[in-house]
């Protein structure tokens, strides 16, 4: 049976969506961001700082209040009453004392040998050696030794408190065993101020005088362990030890009594040195006019003028009762004027030392 030819019904169109509401107005775009400001110009580079020096690390630089303060005059009174808060600078006298101590304590190059001489005995040569050595030992940080090189029994060992009976001769008898400082120290007595003293033989029965070869051998040992070696020479200039002492001496101290014969003897000492090839030593020497009394009959000022024309420095040491006794010397028991004189003497002698080169960066 034939299927009738029929047309499919047309589809019903979908309903139209409702119209959209009108679009809202778009917001205005934000204003453009301004460009960032240019970076500031770099600050000018400071000049290169000076290379730091050791002086930049001084006490005054690093401590708010340096230790200590003025010790005399009105400056000391202000410092003490303020409990250390006020620290006025020291006065002229105190500055002068500090300057003397700085000269005494300056580093030296190598071992310095100081010979203390006098043409005649009894003028204070041994006393000068002991006091000069004590001042050096008190103010320096290195080792200082005084040696009695008297060919006869000397008295240097009597001017200190002995802590050993050993002598220079004993040291020389064992010289091949001296390898360290402690080995040498066993033959020396040490004072409270750190001065070491090697005494001479005290037994007059010993028939061997301290002579030229003895001193050469002793000096060769001491210069290995000490910065300063003071030699208390015997009276006169002709005994054999002087043939070793004078050629090796770096500094010479000539002791004179404040009298006509004492001054003449000291002047003759300088004459002899100049005639025998020691003109440099004589010209650089320091003369000590010893035991000067306030009301002496000799014009000490004229003596001082005479020696000032012949040597490097002249120092007066006043008479002192503590030294007159010939007993053990204690610096603190000296009169203040005597103490000042020995400090001045030490500074004058130290002025002749060659200074150690300043250490610093290469």
Regions picked out by a protein language model, each given a short descriptive name:
Residues 1-64:
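Intrinsically disordered, low-complexity Pro/Gly-rich regions
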Residues 22-23, 42-115:
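Extreme N-terminal, non-catalytic leader segments
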Residues 96-101, 111-151, 156-159, 173, ...:
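Walker A/P-loop phosphate-binding motif and the immediately C-terminal alpha-helix
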Residues 223-227, 239-260:
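Inter-motif core of Ras-like GTPase G domains
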Residues 139-196:
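Phosphate-binding loop that captures ATP/GTP phosphates
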Residues 326-362:
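NTP-binding/hydrolysis catalytic cores, primarily Walker-type P-loop NTPases
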Residues 186-192, 196-239:
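Phosphate-binding/switch loop-helix module in NTP-utilizing enzymes
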Residues 291-335:
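Beta-strand-loop-alpha "switch" segments that mediate conformational coupling across diverse proteins
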